């Protein structure tokens, strides 16, 4: 299994329940795909470097996980179709 790190930015209009629901949804994508979530770090609301879709701030969430090489592709697909995600990035921590 490879180690990965993903950072995603949620829409700032989400309330606490909406944030938790989205984080749990993405964690379940990882665990249902055979991965293992190691750490979830909620950075909170921060100002964006530039405006994205008429939004100046977002809620940053950092997740470290282990999985096989196919899971990041599925997670990327889920991020792309989610309306609550402003931006996302998935990187491999080791080869």
From Swiss-Prot:
Belongs to the bacterial ribosomal protein bS6 family. The gene is rpsF. InterPro entries: Ribosomal_bS6 (IPR000529), Ribosomal_bS6_sf (IPR035980), Ribosomal_S6_plastid/chlpt (IPR020814), Transl_elong_EF1B/ribsomal_bS6 (IPR014717). Binds together with bS18 to 16S ribosomal RNA. Coiled coil: none annotated. It comes from Clostridium acetobutylicum (strain ATCC 824 / DSM 792 / JCM 1419 / IAM 19013 / LMG 5710 / NBRC 13948 / NRRL B-527 / VKM B-1787 / 2291 / W). GO terms for molecular function: small ribosomal subunit rRNA binding; structural constituent of ribosome. One of its GO terms (biological process) is translation. GO terms for cellular component: cytoplasm; ribonucleoprotein complex; ribosome. Keywords: Ribonucleoprotein, Ribosomal protein, RNA-binding, rRNA-binding. This is Small ribosomal subunit protein bS6. Pfam families: Ribosomal_S6.
């Amino acid at each position: 299994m490879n180690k990965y790190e993903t950072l995603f930015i949620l829409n700032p209009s989400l309330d606490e329940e909406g944030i938790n629901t989205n984080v749990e949804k993405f964690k379940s994508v990882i665990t249902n795909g055979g991965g293992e979530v190691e750490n979830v770090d909620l950075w909170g609301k921060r100002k964006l470097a530039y405006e994205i879709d008429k939004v100046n701030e977002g809620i940053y969430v950092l997740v470290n996980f282990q999985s096989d090489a196919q899971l990041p592709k599925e997670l990327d697909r889920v991020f792309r179709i989610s309306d609550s995600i402003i931006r996302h990035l998935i990187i491999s921590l080791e080869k």
